[in-house]
C-alpha cells in the first residue's frame, strides 16, 4: 500500500508540473528554417549592396560568420559533453572536429600571423590531443553510447551538416567545375562565392546541432540519473506525460 501511494503521489506530482512544450523540437525546426531563410536574404542584400568581391573574399564577412558558427557549435557540444553523463566521448570528438574546422577557415590569418599551415599545429594538435584523451577514457562505452546518441536530433543535424560540408562544398571548391563550361569574367570569384555561401549554410546546420545538444543535455535540468534516450526524448518532447484518467481510482484502491 505504501509503495502504491508513493507511486501515486509521484504521478500526481508529475501531472502537476507537466513539461513545457513552448520550445520543443518541431518549434525549433521552424525557427531554424526561418533563421536560414533570413540568412539567405541577408546574403542577397549584402551582395547587392557592397558587391560579391567584398562579401565572398578570403576572411570576408561570410567566412568570418562561418568561423563564428563553427566556434558556437564547438562550444555547445563541449558544454553538452560536460553536462551529459552519457555519450560524452562522441560529443567531445564532434566538438573537436568543429573546432578544427573553425581554425581551418582561419588558415590565412594563422599563416599571416604565424607560419604556413599554422592552424594545423596551433589548433589541430591540441584538439587532436583532447579527442584522443576522450577516446581513450571512453573506449569501453563509445560504441554503445555512440549508437544511441546518433539517434538524437543533435547528432542527426550534425551528421547532415558534416556530410554537406565535406562533399558538396568540397566539390564546389574544384576549379574545373567552373572553368570547364567556358570562360567567364571572373570564374575564380564565382567559384569562391558559391563555395563560401554553401559552406555558410553547412556551418549553420552545425550550429543548430550544437543547440540541440544543449537542449538534450539540459532537458529539464535533471539528466544525471537518466540515459541519453530519455534526455533526448524529453528534449524533443516526443514522449510527453499525459494525464491518467484512472489515477484517482488507483490511489483510492
Name each region found by the language model.
Residues 44-54, 104-114, 171-182:
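Juxtamembrane "helix-exit" motif on the non-cytosolic side of transmembrane helices
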Residues 95-151:
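Membrane-proximal helix-loop-helix units in multi-pass membrane proteins
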Residues 25-35, 85-96, 153-159:
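Membrane-interfacial loop-to-transmembrane alpha-helix junctions, especially the N-terminal start
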Residues 35-36, 66-79, 124-138, 197-213:
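Hydrophobic cores of alpha-helical transmembrane segments in multi-pass inner/ER membrane proteins
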Residues 54-64, 111-123, 184-195:
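Non-cytosolic membrane-interface motifs at loop->transmembrane helix junctions
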Residues 168-182, 194-246:
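C-terminal transmembrane-bundle signature of multipass membrane proteins
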Amino acid at each position: 500500500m505504501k509503495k502504491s501511494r508513493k507511486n501515486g503521489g509521484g504521478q500526481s506530482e508529475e501531472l502537476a508540473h507537466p513539461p513545457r512544450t513552448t520550445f520543443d523540437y518541431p518549434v525549433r525546426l521552424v525557427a531554424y528554417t526561418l533563421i536560414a531563410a533570413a540568412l539567405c536574404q541577408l546574403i542577397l542584400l549584402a551582395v547587392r549592396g557592397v558587391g560579391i568581391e567584398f562579401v565572398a573574399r578570403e576572411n570576408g564577412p561570410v567566412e568570418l560568420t562561418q568561423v563564428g558558427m563553427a566556434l558556437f557549435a564547438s562550444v555547445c557540444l563541449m558544454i553538452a559533453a560536460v553536462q551529459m553523463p552519457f555519450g560524452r566521448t562522441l560529443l567531445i570528438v564532434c566538438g573537436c572536429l568543429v573546432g578544427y574546422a573553425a581554425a581551418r577557415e582561419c588558415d590565412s590569418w594563422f599563416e599571416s600571423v604565424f607560419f604556413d599551415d599554422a592552424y594545423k599545429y596551433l589548433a589541430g594538435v591540441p584538439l587532436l590531443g583532447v579527442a584522443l584523451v576522450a577516446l581513450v577514457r571512453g573506449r569501453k562505452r563509445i560504441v554503445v553510447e555512440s549508437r544511441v546518441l546518433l539517434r538524437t536530433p543533435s547528432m542527426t543535424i550534425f551528421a547532415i551538416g558534416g556530410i554537406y560540408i565535406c562533399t558538396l562544398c568540397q566539390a564546389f571548391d574544384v576549379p574545373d567545375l567552373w572553368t570547364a563550361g567556358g570562360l567567364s569574367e571572373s570564374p575564380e570569384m564565382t567559384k569562391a562565392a558559391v563555395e563560401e555561401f554553401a559552406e555558410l549554410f553547412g556551418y549553420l546546420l552545425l550550429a543548430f546541432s550544437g543547440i540541440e545538444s544543449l537542449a538534450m543535455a539540459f532537458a529539464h535540468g535533471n539528466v544525471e540519473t537518466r540515459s541519453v534516450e530519455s534526455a533526448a526524448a524529453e528534449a524533443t518532447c516526443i514522449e510527453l506525460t499525459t494525464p491518467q484518467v484512472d489515477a484517482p481510482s488507483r490511489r483510492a484502491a
